[in-house]
Structure formats: structure tokens, C-alpha cells
Design a protein with these regions (language model features):
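Flavin-dependent oxidoreductase catalytic cores
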Residues: 2-236, 240, 244-251, 255, ...
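Local beta-strand N-terminus motif with an aromatic residue
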Residues: 6, 95, 160, 315-316, ...
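Short glycine-enriched, charge-decorated loop/helix-capping segments at active-site entrances
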Residues: 35, 112-117, 273-278, 335-336
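Short, structured coil segments at secondary-structure junctions
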Residues: 134-135, 158-159, 295, 314, ...
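Short acidic loop-to-helix transition motifs that present clustered carboxylates
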Residues: 146-149, 170, 304-307, 348, ...
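Rossmann-like dinucleotide/flavin-binding elements
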Residues: 227-259, 300-314, 321-335, 339-401, ...
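Rossmann-like dinucleotide-binding cores of NAD(P)H-dependent redox enzymes
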Residues: 255-294, 371-426
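A conserved short coil-to-beta-strand element within the FAD-binding core of flavoproteins
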Residues: 300-313, 422-436
Length: 505
């Protein structure tokens, strides 16, 4: 690394990695000089940093990332972390700074990437206390720091001398420059969704929900591909795909009009942002709206767009971003669907936000969705009903989220005593008026009864809202469906598609 031009290295001795395993009394069962008491367990690490210092010299920066609490019974807790610090402090001439991290490659894995389901910057208090034990050694702040003010706080109150940023720099590589120049309002904020982690693990490539330009050589600059011929782009819809396309097209030099059916932007992401753990999502559409306003986008809001509304704007091209709607699951018969007594996930989410009262009894959520918003609604339902039961025909819940987020979801569901039943689906709604829901096992058809049921909610697959597509094309317009209107997908797909479509116009 030094020969390649790097000025330092960080040794990752936390998060369950190899050096962590040597330090931990739970995982280190060795009986030689590298196991047993604490000094022996730390020997591998102390010998390593000594060798690096000897080879690379005093000017080469050596940082240590150490375990604070790993969440493993019999592993490393804060008292043990303090003891490890004491051993390493005796070798402080061989490293320049340290910090502490949480979680391990175990059921506590999710703790190493905290998100909005918990407190902001949750580890700073413990980092401050650990640092205070050896105040002459430089320390770093880390863990769910997404705002420049949080970083400044850690630097000013004695917690740290430097701040480590990972996910926020993926979302906006210019984060430090914008903060330093007084342009924090132009930062594209990390929403701590952990999609970057998932993409690296599952796809082998870096990607971000809120930064479609991640990985571009010039992503730290706000550059756009200027157009040679201005067009009037009408965007129908105001969700995140619509807004990404709108501000990108306007910054390129197009004239852009947005028609939205409410007076706010964000679409279904705005709903998710008001549910447990979703608050950071508001920064996605807040940024998009700010950029759109600054780029001169014209907004027509509180209007459910009809064909004549679009034609009246005389567009050169229409981006159709009218979202998606919940499908009717097979088990939901037409008579029950027509009565409107079994709401979709989104309908229940909106009712919870609107403030429906508390209801005794059991609420059943039929989960065919398996994404984060489903469990955000379930957790909010737990504040309004005596019991929540999740029913899914699949082999586990949260099947379509990353491992790290699934662990967090499971922890919170169990914390709230939310029951989940796998390999099952509704069999009959005949007893529902009497509070009974019959469910059957999808493999052996065995039927069982859920009692005291007061409401049933379905999280089903979604269908594109394309009611304007054919009539607009029949009027000779170029119409491009984007986002969920093209195909219901993830937040990442929505922002990326909006950005890339806008760059083809």
C-alpha cells in the first residue's frame, strides 16, 4: 500500500474479522502464545502493528478499528474493550489513532451499520468514555453520522479528533467540501438504508438508493450533460423517480413541468418516511425538490392529471411516473374487496399516520411483499392493536431485504412480540365477521384458525398505474413510463431510472 502511494492503513480488528476473533475470549480457544490471557490474545495484533511501523516508518499512518461491544455472549463487552485498550496503549508508539465499532459476524451483525430504527450516532457516548481512558491517543468518531453538525459535535466535545464517514460518502462524495463551503443544504444525504452493503455482498458492485452517479469518475462534481436542443418535458407524477428525472432534465437545460396529484412530493416514499425507521427517506425527495426548484422546474400540484391536462401543456415528451397500486390477492374475494374492509398495506399505513384509534384484538398482516415498508407498518400497527400476526406463504419473513436489515427487522418484531407464521396463506374469510380467520399450510393444506381477529391487511404485489399511457400515445405524444409506473421496484431502481432516462432526452 505504501509503495502504491497510500499514506496510511486502517487495521479492521472489529466486526468479527480475524483480529477481532483473536481478541475475543469467546472465539479464541488457542492454547499457544496467541491464546489464553488478554495479552496473548492481543499478541497477533500488537506484533502486526509493530511490523508495519518497522517496515513503513513513523510517517505512515496506522489506525485501529477495535471492538466496542460485539453482541456475542461471552465475547467482548465494554469492560473487555477497556481492558483491550489498556494492553494496546502500551504499544501506542506503533499506531496513530483508534476507534471502536459494534457488532460481529453473528446475530449482532446489524449493529455495525445502525439505521433510523434506533438513536442517531448511537455509539458516540461509549466512544467518548473509551477515548477518555487514554486521552493522549487520537481517536475517531464512527457510526450513523450523516450530518455535518453531528460530525462537528463529535469533534468539539472531545469525543474524537477525526470523523470516519463511510455510507455518507457513497451517497455524496462531495459531503466534506459542501459542508466546509457552507453548502450543506446541497448535500445528498445518506438514508442509512444499507443498500450499498447489500449490493456489495450480493452483486459485487457499489450502488446507492440516493446517488445514481455513484462510481462515476466525476461524481464529486455537480456536472450535467448539457442539451443542444431544449425540449419541453412534462413529468406526470411527483414520486422519487419523477423528481429525479425532473431536476436532472432541468439541470441539463430542458424546460420541465411536473404535474402532481397532491401538494407534496415523494409519492409512496413520503408515506414510508412517516413510519418507524423511515424518517431518513425524506432527505431523498427533499434534495430532489430543492434541486428542481433551483433548476426552474414548474410545478402543478393538487391535480390528478387527465389527458387534457397533459395536452394543454404542449409537451415534446411525457415521462409517466404515476406509480403503482396494490393488486387484489387471490384469497381476497370480490365481495370482500368491494366492501373495502380489508385494506392494502399502503392504505393501512396511511390510516395509521392519520391517527386511527386503538383497537383491541388481533390484526393480521398477510405478507407477500417482504420489503422494509411492510415491517414498518407492522411495527406501527403494534401501537394500535393488542396483537399482530404476520402470515406469509414463504419460508421466512423479510425474504427480500438484506441479511443485515433482516436481522434488525427480526430483532424489532420479537421485541414487540409480533408473531409470524410461515408457509401459510388465508383459506377462507367466511368466519371473519365473527373474528376468525382460517389459514392453511401451503404444503400440506392443513387448516388452522386465528381467533380474535379485528382486521386483516394485505401486502401484495403491485401493478403499474398506466391509465394515461395509451390515450396519450393515441394523441401522438412520446410517452416514457418510469419508476413504478414502468414496473414496481425498489427505491434504488426508481432514482436510478429517473436519472438515466433524463440523461437520454
Amino acid at each position: 500500500l505504501q509503495r502504491a502511494g497510500f499514506t496510511g492503513v486502517e487495521i479492521s480488528a472489529g466486526h468479527g474479522h480475524l483480529f477481532h476473533q483473536f481478541l475475543s475470549p469467546w472465539s479464541n480457544r488457542r492454547t499457544d502464545d496467541y491464546g489464553g490471557d488478554l495479552r496473548n490474545r492481543a499478541r497477533f495484533l500488537t506484533e502486526l502493528i509493530s511490523a508495519i511501523r518497522s517496515t513503513c516508518g513513523r510517517a505512515f499512518v496506522i489506525a485501529l478499528k477495535l471492538p466496542g461491544e460485539d453482541g456475542v455472549a461471552g465475547g467482548i463487552d465494554l469492560p473487555m474493550a477497556s481492558a483491550i485498550n489498556g494492553v494496546l496503549a502500551d504499544h501506542s508508539e506503533n499506531f496513530d489513532l483508534w476507534t471502536w465499532v459494534w457488532g460481529a459476524h453473528a446475530r449482532s451483525l446489524y449493529q455495525h451499520l445502525p439505521d433510523a430504527t434506533g438513536a442517531r450516532h448511537p455509539y458516540l457516548g461509549d466512544i467518548h468514555r473509551l477515548r477518555a481512558e487514554h486521552p493522549t491517543i487520537h481517536s475517531g468518531a464512527i457510526g450513523y453520522l450523516t450530518d455535518p453538525n453531528e460530525c462537528e459535535m463529535a469533534l468539539n466535545d472531545g469525543t474524537a479528533d477525526v470523523v470516519f464517514l463511510g455510507r455518507p460518502l457513497i451517497t455524496d462524495a462531495a459531503f466534506p467540501n459542501k459542508a466546509a463551503s457552507g453548502n450543506a443544504n446541497r448535500i445528498r444525504y445518506c438514508v442509512s438504508c444499507n443498500s450499498c452493503w447489500r449490493n456489495i455482498i450480493e452483486a459485487g458492485a457499489l450502488a446507492c438508493d440516493n446517488n445514481p452517479r455513484v462510481g462515476d469518475p466525476d461524481e464529486h462534481r455537480e456536472l450535467t450533460l448539457a442539451v443542444t436542443h431544449q425540449r419541453h418535458v412534462v413529468v406526470v407524477g411527483s414520486g422519487v423517480s419523477a423528481m429525479e428525472a425532473a431536476h436532472t432534465a432541468a439541470q441539463r437545460g430542458h424546460r420541465v413541468s411536473v404535474i402532481g396529484n397532491i401538494d407534496q412530493v415523494g409519492g409512496k416514499t413520503r408515506l414510508h418516511a412517516q413510519l418507524p425507521g423511515g424518517e431518513n427517506l425524506s432527505s431523498v425527495y427533499d434534495y430532489q425538490y430543492l434541486m428542481a426548484r433551483q433548476a426552474g422546474v414548474h410545478f402543478i400540484q393538487n391535480r390528478q392529471a387527465q389527458v387534457e391536462d397533459v395536452l394543454a401543456l404542449n409537451p415534446d415528451v411525457v415521462l409517466l411516473a404515476t406509480g403503482a397500486r396494490a393488486s387484489q390477492p387471490i384469497w381476497l374475494t370480490d365481495d370482500w374487496a368491494e366492501m373495502g374492509l380489508i385494506p392494502s398495506l399502503r392504505e393501512m399505513g396511511q390510516s395509521l399516520i392519520d391517527g386511527i384509534g386503538r383497537s383491541p384484538g388481533r390484526a393480521v398482516l398477510i405478507d407477500h411483499d417482504h420489503t422494509e415498508m411492510t415491517y414498518a407498518v407492522a411495527l406501527q400497527m403494534a401501537t394500535r392493536f393488542d396483537q399482530i400476526t404476520l402470515v406469509t406463504s414463504r419460508e421466512r419473513i423479510a425474504n427480500d431485504v438484506s441479511l443485515i436489515n433482516r436481522q434488525n427487522i427480526l430483532q424489532r418484531l420479537f421485541d414487540h412480540d409480533i408473531e409470524h407464521i410461515c408457509h401459510a396463506e388465508p383459506d377462507s374469510l367466511d368466519g371473519l365477521e365473527a373474528g376468525r380467520l382460517m389459514i392453511k399450510n401451503v404444503y400440506n393444506d392443513k387448516v388452522s384458525e386465528l381467533s380474535d381477529v379485528v382486521t386483516v391487511v394485505h401486502a401484495s404485489s403491485r401493478l403499474p398505474n398506466q391509465y394515461l399511457l395509451k390515450p396519450l400515445r393515441a394523441n401522438g405524444l412520446e410517452v416514457i413510463p418510469i419508476g413504478d409506473c414502468r414496473a414496481p421496484r425498489s427505491l434504488m431502481a426508481a432514482t436510478h431510472e429517473g436519472y438515466h432516462i433524463a440523461n437520454t432526452l
